[in-house]
Amino acid sequence: MQVILLEKVINLGNLGDIVKVKDGYARNFLIPSKKARRATQTAIAEFEVKRAELEKAAAEKLAAAQAEGEKLNGLNVQITQKSGVDGRLFGSVTNADIAEALAGQGYKLEKSQVRLPNGPLKMVGDHPVSVALHTDVVVDVTVSVVGESV
């Protein structure tokens, strides 16, 4: 199925690109999340009329994400978990825990925006974590996991 992208989609294209994707991906993800529309002649004509408006909205989202990223970049977040004597945690620190800790400091993030490349954190110490605020804005945050003896 051919679709017109209404915003930048990672590994697919930019705003206004007409791309061919699998039907299920278009019907179940791109179209319901308003990231794309079917590429019919009328849809293409309507898109060209609204193109400047959509580009302006995308630029505003990017500027807001960059401003938020400047505040968030290099931030140190401290999370306390129960741990054993050897520094291993009972349980783990997940992206939801990190998003919740950042929300406590006044940053609104979804847990899907926190990227843990090696999975949940299972050791006490400082761990670098990436936070994707926008497809083009990724900042680094240091998560300090402090062990609480049982």
UniProtKB/Swiss-Prot annotation:
Keyword Transferase: no
Recorded GO MF terms: rRNA binding; structural constituent of ribosome
PROSITE patterns documented for this protein: RIBOSOMAL_L9
UniProt keyword list: Ribonucleoprotein, Ribosomal protein, RNA-binding, rRNA-binding
Top-rank taxon: Bacteria
A Pfam family: Ribosomal_L9_N
SUPFAM superfamilies: L9 N-domain-like (SSF55658), Ribosomal protein L9 C-domain (SSF55653)
GO annotation, cellular component aspect: ribonucleoprotein complex; ribosome
Family to which this protein belongs: Belongs to the bacterial ribosomal protein bL9 family.
UniProt-listed PANTHER family: 50S RIBOSOMAL PROTEIN L9
UniProt xrefs under HAMAP family: Ribosomal_bL9
Protein name: Large ribosomal subunit protein bL9
Taxonomic source organism: Cupriavidus taiwanensis (strain DSM 17343 / BCRC 17206 / CCUG 44338 / CIP 107171 / LMG 19424 / R1)
Name of the gene encoding the protein in the UniProt record: rplI
